[in-house]
Curated annotation (Swiss-Prot):
HAMAP family cross-referenced by the UniProt entry: Ribosomal_bL35
One cellular component (GO) term of this entry: cytosolic large ribosomal subunit
Signal peptide residues on this chain, from the entry's feature table: none
NCBIfam families tied to this protein: rpmI_bact
Record field: transmembrane: none
Family in the record: Belongs to the bacterial ribosomal protein bL35 family.
GO annotation, biological process: translation
UniProt entry keywords in alphabetical sequence: Ribonucleoprotein, Ribosomal protein
Name of this chain's protein: Large ribosomal subunit protein bL35
InterPro entries: Ribosomal_bL35, Ribosomal_bL35-like, Ribosomal_bL35_CS, Ribosomal_bL35_sf
Organism of this sequence: Aliarcobacter butzleri (strain RM4018)
Gene3D superfamilies: 4.10.410.60
Gene Ontology MF term list: structural constituent of ribosome
Length: 65
């Protein structure tokens, strides 16, 4: 049987924490931020966690399921 290969784009975007939750970054934070309010930019700051309904799919792309 061939080796399981992880999706390289998913490896770069997600990190699995010790308690099993998955850490992700926020979208819409790269450029053209002048038209966005300070409150919206502040809420997009920092790492977020993946919702529980998406965890199984992401773990399978990372070959950790």
């Amino acid at each position: 049987m061939p080796k399981m290969k992880s999706v390289k784009g998913a490896v770069k975007r997600f990190k699995v924490k010790k308690n099993g939750t998955i850490k992700r970054g926020s979208a819409f934070r790269s450029h053209i931020l002048t038209k966005m309010s300070q409150k919206r930019k502040r809420n997009l700051r920092g790492p977020k966690t993946v919702h529980s309904t998406n965890v199984a799919g992401i773990l399978s792309t990372l070959c950790k399921a």
